[in-house]
Design a protein with these regions (language model features):
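Phosphate/NTP-binding elements of NTP-utilizing enzymes
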Residues: 1-237
Length: 237
């Protein structure tokens, strides 16, 4: 534990801290109307070209999730290879990013200081794999969406992270929870299939990988609940 003298702020830092605390009094303001999930899914302006290729089965499930009378904080997608699970996970994440983009001072939605960074994590085994699969697909979806190009442009100079500096928000690749320590992790996608061996043999390595996926799921779920659950319920979002 640090000594009190090590935590003492200089006058300049103290002023900065007081200014940041004052920022928390600024409320998040709606700057754009949020269109219904039905309209959003059918409109290439928001979803991009992928709006035309969403299976009706998945589309109805997405509508049910966002129109549920009870808030849904977790979605588990199952099915065989090529059934669209990764694409649907990305569309759900894209919708949440879109909703957040319709507010100014996004951190204030969760009673955080304006300078606080909001983070979403995309868990995969490694960056090269992530760029070829779900994380890379999400980045392309954002870049192909006219809405995001006009109203919520990311920093295109960065590919390892999807960053909106104007909103203090990012989607970051992560291979473990150590990549999210100290952040305000509001949500995540765990591409579980990429944590398993492609062989059906149960090996010690396969068990370790499975345990890692379970650990990531448990830790991120607990962190999200502790940091955001009460704030989310009380927010206007």
């Amino acid at each position: 534990m640090q000594e009190f003298s090590q935590q003492t702020l200089g006058l300049e830092n103290l002023v900065d801290t007081l200014v940041q605390m004052k920022d928390t009094e600024k409320k998040a303001a709606r700057i754009r109307d949020i269109v219904s999930i039905e309209e959003w899914l059918d409109n290439e302006y928001y979803v991009g070209p992928d709006a035309l290729s969403i299976y009706p089965y998945w589309k109805q499930h997405i509508i049910n999730i966002f129109n549920s009378p009870v808030r849904i904080n977790e979605v588990i997608l199952t099915g065989g290879l090529g059934t669209g699970k990764t694409t649907i996970a990305n569309i759900i994440l894209l919708r949440k990013i879109y909703e957040l983009s319709c507010y100014s001072n996004i951190p204030a939605l969760f009673n955080l200081m304006s300078s606080s960074k909001i983070m979403l994590a995309y868990f995969n085994l490694n960056l090269s794999q992530a760029l070829l699969t779900g994380y890379g697909q999400l980045k392309e979806m954002i870049d192909n969406s006219p809405y995001f190009q006009e109203h919520f442009m990311r920093n295109i100079k960065k590919d390892a992270e999807i960053v909106w500096p104007q909103a203090n928000m990012m989607v970051r690749f992560a291979s473990g929870t150590q990549h999210t320590i100290g952040t305000n992790l509001i949500g995540s996608v765990l591409d579980e299939a990429n944590f398993y061996s492609k062989t059906e043999k149960i090996t010690e390595q396969a068990v370790q990988i499975q345990d890692k996926a379970k650990q990531i799921y448990t830790e991120t779920r607990n962190r999200r609940k502790i940091t955001f659950y009460d704030k989310w319920r009380k927010s206007i979002y």
